[in-house]
Regions:
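C-terminal and inter-domain tail/linker signature
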Residues: 14, 23-26, 32-190
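Residues at the start of alpha-helices and the adjacent loop-to-helix junctions
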Residues: 2-4, 44
């Protein structure tokens, strides 16, 4: 059972080291993989956690996998975090991440605790960040960065994802945006 996002890098390589066969197959074969005869079918919560684990690793990890958007994001997916305006749909989500990663080429987030699942919802705690070495970035709700500011951000958050028809329908996160914006020099500490 997938329990810790911190080990996703090894899992994503799909070596199957110590993984239950159905989880290794799910990670290799995507959300439509099914157990072979004799294997126990994963619960909906287990499937949803595995799907969210693949999403976190592919979308927020480094290197990122742009194809993960077409593979796992619902066509009208909602992506919403306190630092940025809400994004809706695959094209908008892709555009957001392309701009974010151009500005922060080393951007990476990883799991800080076990995933929790209930029904269609999966909750994950994470941490991460990056150094702004790319073009000017103005996607924050307040302020912007000039080109290659060299400023570093490292912060944490908690995200609630809703899975619908084996796709990520919503990703809504609460992050420590004040810390990130202060580190980037956009907000001034009191």
């Amino acid at each position: 059972m997938l329990t810790n996002l911190g080990s996703l890098h090894a899992i994503a390589a799909c070596r199957g080291d110590g993984l239950r066969p159905e989880l290794a197959r799910l990670l290799r074969g995507g959300a439509n993989a099914f157990p072979t005869p004799g294997e126990t079918k994963m619960s909906r919560e287990q499937e949803n956690k595995a799907l969210v684990g693949r999403w976190f690793e592919g979308f927020w990890g480094n290197p990122w996998n742009p194809q993960i958007i077409d593979e796992l994001a619902a066509p009208d997916m909602l992506l919403q975090y306190s630092l940025h305006a809400p994004r809706r749909g695959r094209r908008d989500v892709r555009s957001f991440m392309l701009d974010f990663r151009a500005a922060f080429p080393d951007l990476k987030f990883w799991g800080a605790a076990d995933l929790i699942a209930e029904g269609d919802y999966v909750v994950g705690r994470w941490e991460g960040g990056g150094i702004h070495t790319g073009p000017a970035f103005s996607d924050f709700l307040v302020g912007s960065l000039p080109p290659a500011s060299g400023r570093k951000m490292h912060f944490t958050g908690t995200t609630v994802l809703r899975v619908e028809n084996r796709m990520i329908a919503e990703e809504v996160g609460l992050d420590d945006g004040v810390t990130a914006l202060t580190q980037l020099g956009i907000l001034k500490a009191a």
